[in-house]
Amino acid sequence: MVTVFGILNLTEDSFFDESRRLDPAGAVTAAIEMLRVGSDVVDVGPAASHPDARPVSPADEIRRIAPLLDALSDQMHRVSIDSFQPETQRYALKRGVGYLNDIQGFPDPALYPDIAEADCRLVVMHSAQRDGIATRTGHLRPEDALDEIVRFFEARVSALRRSGVAADRLILDPGMGFFLSPAPETSLHVLSNLQKLKSALGLPLLVSVSRKSFLGATVGLPVKDLGPASLAAELHAIGNGADYVRTHAPGDLRSAITFSETLAKFRSRDARDRGLDHA
C-alpha cells in the first residue's frame, strides 16, 4: 500500500504557485483538506529548495510551522517537516511530528543523538549537491546515477544505523530534477530503474516528481500544466516499487491509485475465473 505525501509550502517562492500557503489560517485549511482528499501525510515546507530559492533562517522556519503544528496537534503522526536545518529539525522532533524530510539526507552527526531518541520516520534524500538547495551546476550523468545513489545511501544509512536509528524508521528518496542534474535524462534514467534501486538498498523508497523540471523538459510544458505528466510519472513510480509518493495533487493521485487497485483486482479475478473454466 503506497503512502501519499501531500506538499504544503509555507513560502513565498516555491516553484509551483498553487502549493503556497502564506497565512497560518490558510495553511491549516489546506492541510486539513489534503488529509481529507487523500494525503496520508502532509509534508510541510517552511523554505523552498529550488535553484532560485531565497534563504530562510531557522527562526523564520519555526515561526512558519508553529501555528500549523498547534492546529494539528492531535494528528502529528500525519505531519512531515521538510527542512535541512538542525534547529528546525530539533523543534519538529520536540513537537512530535511523524516524519522528518531532509533534502541533504541528514549529514550532521551532531543531530543523530536527537534523532535516535525520537521515534519519527526519516526521509533521507540523495542529492548530487550534497548540501544546500538544488542548483543548476551539478550534473550527475545517467550512466553514473544509480551507482552514485547506492553508494550515498549505503554510507548514510550505515552512519544513521550506527548512531542507534532503527532501519524500519528509514525511507530513501533518490532525488529528482535539479537534485540530480539539470539534464532530464538523469531523472528519467533513475525513474525507470526504481526496482534496481530498491533491490540494491532493501529499504522503502519515496519518489517526488510532482511538476519537476525534467517533466517540463520532456513534454515541453510549463510548471502549471504538468499535472497530467506528474500523475503519469507517479503511477509509474508506484508500479515500479515506490512505497511513498510526494505530490502537489494528493486527491488526484489517491483517485488514480484507487482505480488502479480496483482494476488489478478485476484482472486477478478474471484470470482466476479463466483458470476455473479450463480446469
UniProtKB/Swiss-Prot annotation:
Question: Which reaction(s) are listed as its catalytic activity?
Answer: (7,8-dihydropterin-6-yl)methyl diphosphate + 4-aminobenzoate = 7,8-dihydropteroate + diphosphate
User: Metal-binding among the record's keywords?
Assistant: yes
Q: Which parts of the chain span the membrane according to its record?
A: none
Which function does this protein serve? Answer: Catalyzes the condensation of para-aminobenzoate (pABA) with 6-hydroxymethyl-7,8-dihydropterin diphosphate (DHPt-PP) to form 7,8-dihydropteroate (H2Pte), the immediate precursor of folate derivatives. Confers resistance to sulfonamide antibiotics, including sulfamethoxazole (SMX), sulfadiazine and sulfisoxazole. The type II enzyme is stable whereas type I DHPS loses its activity rapidly.
Cofactor(s) needed, names only, are: Mg(2+)
This chain belongs to which protein, by name?
A: Dihydropteroate synthase type-1
Q: Which residues form a coiled coil?
A: none
Q: In which pathway does it act?
A: Cofactor biosynthesis; tetrahydrofolate biosynthesis; 7,8-dihydrofolate from 2-amino-4-hydroxy-6-hydroxymethyl-7,8-dihydropteridine diphosphate and 4-aminobenzoate: step 1/2
- One Pfam entry for this protein is Pterin_bind
What keywords are assigned to this protein?
Antibiotic resistance, Folate biosynthesis, Magnesium, Metal-binding, Plasmid, Transferase, Transposable element
One GO term (biological process): response to antibiotic
Task: Quote the record's binding site residues for 4-aminobenzoate.
Answer: S49, F178, S213
Residues binding 6-hydroxymethyl-7,8-dihydropterin? N101, D173, K212
Q: What is its EC number?
A: 2.5.1.15
Family as reported in the entry's similarity comment: Belongs to the DHPS family.
Domain called Pterin-binding: residue spans: 1-258
Q: Which residues bind Mg(2+)?
A: N9
Summary of subunit composition and partner proteins: Homodimer or homotrimer.
EC top class named in words: transferase
Q: Which residues bind (7,8-dihydropterin-6-yl)methyl diphosphate?
A: D82, N101, D173, K212, R246, T247, H248
In the UniProt annotation, what is the result of changing L180K? Fully complements folP deletion mutation in E.coli strain BW25113. Does not adversely impact growth or enzyme expression levels
* Result for mutant: F178G: Similar catalytic efficiency for para-aminobenzoate (pABA) as substrate as wild-type. Significantly increases competitive inhibition by sulfamethoxazole (SMX) versus pABA
Record-linked Gene3D superfamilies: Dihydropteroate synthase-like
Comment field (misc) = The sulI gene is located on various large self-transmissible resistance plasmids and on transposons related to Tn21.
